[in-house]
Swiss-Prot record:
Propeptide span(s): 1-17
Designated name of the protein: Serralysin C
CDD domains: ZnMc_serralysin_like
Ranges occupied by Hemolysin-type calcium-binding repeats: 344-361, 362-379, 380-397
GO biological process: proteolysis
Transmembrane annotation, as ranges: none
């Protein structure tokens, strides 16, 4: 599925105007958060789509299946070296991996096999391996090396292919479990050993590269763990934290080489609080946890649970989108081809945006804005003054209508301001006149349900319906 387009975002005549409310405008803006590709220019650079970025990151066209072989699975071996006669680069001062490094490297390997058709089997002793791990401490001249971080070699049939090397003088390399940058480094170097390149033509130790050298706009940690450049270059903010698993463009890139792993999390998965994923980067146990991830999920009915945060959050369930979670910006994304059905906000003033699936959105405490989009959605505002936004007749049809499950009369609002662009809306009491742009509230006292109907201009029949648990008044509707 693509991004939810029912909020009139593809129609110039429905651009933001004085006709639409601040709640509608906040959703409209959020749906354009990190728009990419399609000829856009961002930061003075060409913007790449996910597929374009994946092609760029795999431009060497090498994998463990050979050259120019795409979408083919691979069963690989890995090894933690115990001793070496030499290091391919000429560096010296070999040190074998410590227990903490081994643990973190295995988690990095797991994060790659979660998203692509890769299996990793550890070997020991004299057995050779596709991917190897070792530390160094000195450069080729025997001097202590404090400048470099790590490096790795692409797949192939040459001496050193698939080997990865880490500077043991760096504290985040020696203790990667306590310093997020160490885990990020392991995942980055394993990416190279699997065939992924940097998004641009740069390398450590070659001049003084910067984001100015980026080939395309989305070359940052926000989009790729293979990047050199901080997430702030593309408008995100991780507040000094680092991601430790493949990001949205990395997932597309590694799947281009080895195919997508369609056995990963096929059940009902929860990401964030109350997570059942058994992955540390998908799991929050308290509000201090900085979640930085791109989700890959192969099936089931899945939930983003960000209920433990008190920050104002923006949560978008559309594939390819980014969310602002737990006080960070642009820190959670959804990989291409993934459907997340449900979202739970926290106690701040949140914006929740659904996709074309039948979503369950729960705002929680705070003054929240909920937009379900297409599909038959169930919306819970929770405590606070909440606004339920509708952008077009496609958002809640007679055949697939939304439920607003906890509406508070006189407190919550239902926002129909987007429909003003077709002409001023007016209320009718018992039946429509046929003129269009008419709204009718129908109270079902026996079941304590309000039916909200809307007949749009230019439509031969009434095809917009929202069902509301509880009674709503005309003053609760923004028209």
């Amino acid at each position: 599925m693509g991004k939810n387009l029912s909020l009139r975002q593809d129609d110039a005549q429905h651009a933001l105007s004085a006709n639409t409310s601040s709640a509608y405008n906040s959703v409209y803006d959020f749906l354009r958060y990190h728009d990419r590709g399609d000829g856009l220019t961002v930061n003075g650079k060409t913007s790449y789509s996910i597929d374009q970025a994946a092609a760029q990151i795999t431009r060497e066209n090498v994998s463990w299946n050979g050259t120019n072989v795409f979408g083919k699975s691979a069963n690989l071996t890995f090894k933690f070296l115990q001793s070496v006669s030499s290091i391919p680069s000429g560096d010296t001062g070999f040190v074998k991996f410590n227990a903490e490094q081994i643990e973190q490297a295995k988690l990095s390997l797991q994060s790659w096999s979660d998203v692509a058709n890769l299996t990793f089997t550890e070997v020991t002793g004299n057995k050779s391996a596709n991917i190897t791990f070792g530390n160094y401490t000195r450069d080729a001249s025997g001097n202590l090396d404090y400048g470099t971080q790590a490096y790795a070699y692409y797949p192939g049939n040459y001496q050193g292919a698939g080997s990865s090397w880490y500077n043991y003088n760096q504290s985040n390399i020696r203790n990667p479990g306590s310093e997020e940058y160490g885990r990020q480094t392991f995942t980055h170097e394993i990416g190279h050993a699997l065939g992924l390149a940097h998004p641009g033509e740069y390398n450590a130790g070659e001049g003084d590269p910067s984001y100015n050298d980026a080939v395309y706009a989305e070359d940052s940690y926000q989009f790729s763990i293979m990047s050199y450049w901080g997430e702030n270059e593309t408008g995100a903010d991780y507040n000094g934290h680092y991601g430790g698993a493949p990001m949205i463009d990395d997932i597309a890139a590694i799947q281009r080489l080895y195919g997508a792993n369609m056995t990963t999390r096929t059940g009902d998965s929860v990401y964030g609080f109350n997570s059942n994923t058994d992955r540390d980067f998908y799991t929050a146990t308290d509000s201090s946890k900085a979640l930085i991830f791109s989700v890959w999920d192969a099936g089931g009915t899945d939930t983003f649970d960000f209920s433990g945060y008190s920050n104002n959050q923006r949560i978008n369930l559309n594939e390819g989108s980014f969310s602002d979670v737990g006080g960070l910006k642009g820190n959670v994304s959804i990989a291409h081809g993934v459907t997340i059905e449900n979202a739970i906000g926290g106690s701040g003033n949140d914006i929740l945006v659904g996709n074309s699936a039948d979503n369950i959105l729960q705002g929680g405490a705070g003054n929240d804005v909920l937009y379900g989009g297409a599909g038959a959605d169930t919306l819970y505002g929770g405590a606070g003054r909440d606004t339920f936004v509708y952008g077009s007749g496609q958002d809640s049809t007679v055949a697939a209508y939304d439920w607003i499950a906890d509406f508070q009369k006189g407190i919550d609002k239902i926002d129909l301001s987007a429909f003003r662009n077709e002409g001023q809306l007016s209320f009718v009491q018992d039946q429509f006149t046929g003129k269009g742009q008419e709204v009718m509230l129908q109270w079902d006292a026996a079941n304590s349900i309000t039916n909200l109907w809307l007949h749009e201009a230019g439509h031969s029949s009434v095809d917009f319906l929202v069902r509301i648990v509880g009674q709503a008044a005309q003053s609760d509707i923004i028209v």
